[in-house]
């Protein structure tokens, strides 16, 4: 089966020794070069950029409004598919005999990661709007990411939560692998944070509540995300946000401990930077870092040099700005504990005074 042809392909390169991601300095006001797209490019009615493949470079997108379609137009999950056969079939959807890139009209580029790009696409025959993550097989093999890719697909397709992006399946051709996912109209939280600056308590508390809700669900299924950051959070209508990018996620029963150092440097926990074993509580630490960044515009331990960042993380060297409210400071400091056992549990995050005080002012009432 074609799915296994990718997984079992003979390796021609060793895995890189470091699996962390270095973020550029996140001083948002003074670093306009960090904006991935200009405001004009973010306009859904702006010109659609060139598609992924050379043969589709002149592919027209006749209805520009498809970039603004409501999430109700997005289908229920399309199950895993190869380019030759649909493996799982959803009776509520058209009975696809196959999926390939030719089945989609490609729109604007939504984002770019180390190993792939994400595009807005429309399924030709149904009009469904999705996001399509495109990865080069050559890159997957070069960096020995076959197992990681398969794990990402398996984890994302197993999750069903309003604050987690849905996976509709995947397919592949000779050169590339394509992940078909839920499309969220307002894009990355990082871009919103970069464009408008730090969030107020009302908006930040709403977002932290939703991420805590998603992580609590994942942890109950013994899944650790391991890469929480604004770039991996998408925003839909009515300030509904969804955690995405499960490339570093892993299934980890409570009795197990991990030692792989991965994720983004500014968000690493003390046990990671000190090469100690860790568990799901690293996500709680990252949630504290996220809360700090949403309220200030930059993560708490950010430095130009990686080693200096590591030292500040291990020493819990947190410089708390005076303009952060006392309730918000309390939440952040209870999440950013050196000892994982001392970190606030995600269920308690949702009942914290900072959350409860701001909840009546959220745009939509959360459950």
From Swiss-Prot:
InterPro entries with a match to the protein in the record: Aur-like, Kinase-like_dom_sf, Prot_kinase_dom, Protein_kinase_ATP_BS, Ser/Thr_kinase_AS
GO molecular function, one term: protein serine kinase activity
Enzyme class: transferase
Keyword Hydrolase recorded: no
Superkingdom to which the source organism belongs: Eukaryota
Pfam families: Pkinase (PF00069)
Post-translational modification Phosphothreonine, affected residues: 260
Catalytic activity: L-seryl-[protein] + ATP = O-phospho-L-seryl-[protein] + ADP + H(+); L-threonyl-[protein] + ATP = O-phospho-L-threonyl-[protein] + ADP + H(+)
Any single GO BP term: attachment of spindle microtubules to kinetochore
GO cellular component entries: chromosome passenger complex; cytoplasm; kinetochore; kinetochore microtubule; microtubule; nucleus; spindle; spindle microtubule
Annotated keywords: ATP-binding, Cell cycle, Centromere, Chromosome, Chromosome partition, Cytoplasm, Cytoskeleton, Kinase, Kinetochore, Nucleotide-binding, Nucleus, Phosphoprotein, Serine/threonine-protein kinase, Transferase
Residue spans crossing the bilayer: none
Residues that, per the record, bind ATP: 110-118, 133
Domain Protein kinase: 104-355
Complex formation: Component of the CPC complex at least composed of IPL1, BIR1 and SLI15.
Remaining remarks: Present with 149 molecules/cell in log phase SD medium.
Similarity-based family: Belongs to the protein kinase superfamily. Ser/Thr protein kinase family. Aurora subfamily.
Name of the featured protein: Aurora kinase
């Amino acid at each position: 089966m074609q799915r296994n042809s990718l997984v079992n392909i003979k390796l021609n390169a060793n895995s890189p020794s470091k699996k962390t991601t270095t973020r550029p300095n996140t001083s948002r006001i003074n670093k306009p070069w960090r904006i991935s797209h200009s405001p004009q490019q973010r306009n859904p009615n702006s010109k659609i950029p060139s598609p992924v493949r050379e043969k589709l470079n002149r592919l027209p997108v006749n209805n520009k409004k498809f970039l603004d379609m409501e999430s109700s137009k997005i289908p229920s999950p399309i199950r895993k598919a190869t380019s030759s056969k649909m493996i799982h079939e959803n009776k509520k959807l058209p009975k696809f005999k196959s999926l390939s890139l030719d089945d989609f009209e490609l729109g604007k580029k939504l984002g770019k990661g180390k190993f792939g790009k994400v595009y807005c696409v429309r399924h030709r025959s149904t009009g469904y709007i999705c996001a399509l993550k495109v990865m080069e097989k050559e890159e997957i093999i070069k960096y020995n990411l076959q197992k990681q890719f398969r794990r990402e697909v398996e984890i994302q397709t197993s999750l069903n939560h309003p604050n987690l992006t849905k996976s509709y399946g995947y397919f592949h051709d000779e050169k590339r692998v394509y992940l078909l996912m839920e499309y969220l109209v307002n894009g990355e939280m990082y871009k919103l944070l970069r464009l408008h600056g730090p969030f107020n308590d009302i908006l930040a508390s709403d977002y932290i509540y939703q991420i805590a809700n998603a992580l609590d669900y994942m942890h109950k299924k013994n899944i650790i995300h391991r890469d929480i950051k604004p770039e991996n959070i998408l925003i839909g209508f009515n300030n509904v946000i969804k955690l995405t990018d499960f490339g570093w996620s892993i299934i980890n029963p409570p009795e197990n401990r991990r030692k792989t150092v991965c994720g983004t440097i500014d968000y690493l926990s003390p046990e990671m930077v000190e090469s100690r074993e860790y568990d799901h509580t690293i996500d709680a630490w990252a949630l504290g870092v996220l809360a700090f960044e949403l309220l200030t515009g930059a993560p708490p331990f950010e430095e130009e040099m990686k080693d200096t960042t590591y030292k500040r993380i291990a020493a819990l060297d947190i410089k708390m700005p005076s303009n952060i409210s006392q309730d918000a400071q309390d939440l952040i400091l209870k999440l950013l504990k050196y000892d994982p056992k001392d970190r606030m549990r995600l269920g308690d995050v949702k009942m914290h005074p900072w959350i409860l005080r701001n909840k009546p002012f959220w745009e939509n009432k959360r459950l």
